[in-house]
């Protein structure tokens, strides 16, 4: 029974350490991204103008095929 308890404790401890490691890596990634975004915003003196507005092109009309099923073109 002591061996099962020992294995269970080791498993839970390993899972906890894995979770802690993953969460710290995610936190570091977010911190780096935020720092990069803040530095990028500091370098920009004024926002760039929005892209020009494009009008929507009309859809292309494709006539239905004149060939019948089972017959050639």
Curated annotation (Swiss-Prot):
Q: Would you tell me the protein name for this molecule? A: Serine rich endogenous peptide 14
Q: Please list the disulfide bridges.
A: none
Q: In which tissues is it expressed?
A: Mostly expressed in seedlings shoots and leaves, and, to a lower extent, in roots, stems, siliques, seeds and flowers.
Q: Which gene encodes it?
A: PROSCOOP14
Q: What happens when the gene is disrupted?
A: Slightly increased growth and fresh weight.
Q: How does it assemble?
A: Interacts with MIK2 (via extracellular leucine-rich repeat domain); this interaction triggers the formation of complex between MIK2 and the BAK1/SERK3 and SERK4 coreceptors, and subsequent BAK1 activation by phosphorylation.
Q: Record the organism.
A: Arabidopsis thaliana (Mouse-ear cress)
Q: Which GO terms describe its cellular component?
A: apoplast; plasma membrane
State the function annotated in the UniProt record: Brassicaceae-specific phytocytokine (plant endogenous peptide released into the apoplast) perceived by MIK2 in a BAK1/SERK3 and SERK4 coreceptors-dependent manner, that modulates various physiological and antimicrobial processes including growth prevention and reactive oxygen species (ROS) response regulation. Inhibits root growth and regulates root meristems. Prevents general growth and development. Exhibits antibacterial effects against Pseudomonas syringae pv. tomato DC3000, Ralstonia solanacearum, Bacillus subtilis and Agrobacterium tumefaciens, thus being an antimicrobial peptide (AMP).
* Biological process annotations from GO: defense response; defense response to bacterium; response to bacterium; response to cold; response to ethylene; response to jasmonic acid; response to salicylic acid; response to salt stress
> Could you tell me which residues belong to the region Disordered?
44-73
| Superkingdom of origin organism | Eukaryota
Entry keyword annotation includes Signal: yes
Q: Which UniProt keywords apply?
A: Apoplast, Cell membrane, Cleavage on pair of basic residues, Membrane, Secreted, Signal
User: Motif span (SxS motif essential for MIK2 binding)?
Assistant: 65-67
Mainly resides where?
A: membrane
* Protein family: Belongs to the serine rich endogenous peptide (SCOOP) phytocytokine family.
GO MF, one term, reads: receptor serine/threonine kinase binding
Map motif SCOOP motif onto the chain. Answer: 59-73
State the signal peptide span. Answer: 1-31
Under what conditions is it induced?
Induced by cold, drought and salt stress, but repressed by pathogenic bacteria Pseudomonas syringae pv. tomato (Pst) DC3000, jasmonate (MeJA), ethylene (ET) and salicylic acid (SA), mainly in shoots.
Compositionally biased tracts (Polar residues): 64-73
Its subcellular locations are:
Cell membrane; Secreted, Extracellular space, Apoplast
């Amino acid at each position: 029974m002591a061996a099962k308890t020992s294995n269970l404790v080791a498993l839970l401890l390993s899972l906890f350490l894995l979770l802690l490691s993953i969460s710290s890596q995610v936190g570091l990634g977010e911190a780096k991204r935020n720092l990069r975004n803040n530095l990028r915003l500091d370098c920009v003196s004024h926002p760039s103008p929005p892209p020009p507005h494009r009008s929507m092109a009309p859809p292309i009309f494709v006539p239905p095929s004149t060939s019948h099923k089972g017959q050639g073109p």
